[in-house]
Amino acid sequence: MGVVMKYSLKLIIVVFIAVVIAACSSKPAEEYKAEAKKEVELKNYSKAVKIYDELADVHSGSKDASEALLEIAKLYHSKLVDSLDEKTSYKKAFSYYEKIYLEYQNSAEAPNALFMAAFLQGNELNNPEEAKKLYKLFIEKYPDSEMVNSAKMELENVGLTPEEILKKNTPQPKK
């Protein structure tokens, strides 16, 4: 029993030291942000995504992490990341928006992320049923948001062509 206890104690000490070293060696979030912004300015979008992703991993659960995830989503949504076709870029953007509203529900970025996820589903990924579900969730979760009226309007028009929306919203002449 004594040998097992000594071994267990040594293992606990080694793990503790490793955790402390890892925690101390991580860069501050501001340093990651500055590096990522520099890469965006240089139009090195893939590199910026990697830096923001690392920030989100290292500072997981923080405000900085949710902000970094939103920046990644916006880069993919804007189709700025090289070597991706449009649909793949939109799907990547959606996955980051989704991660924000699922894992960072109380963050300042969550309402915008949920709205944009719905918008992408309805307007870019041609999935009106998923868009409706997400717009309804947005309206339910964020009834006081300044974007709630936009969500309601999108919900009414999702899946319609521009011509159908115009026809629906234009008074028809009396016969």
Predicted features along the sequence, with ranges:
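Acidic, polar-rich low-complexity tracts and alpha-helical solenoid repeat scaffolds
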Residues: 2-11, 20-175
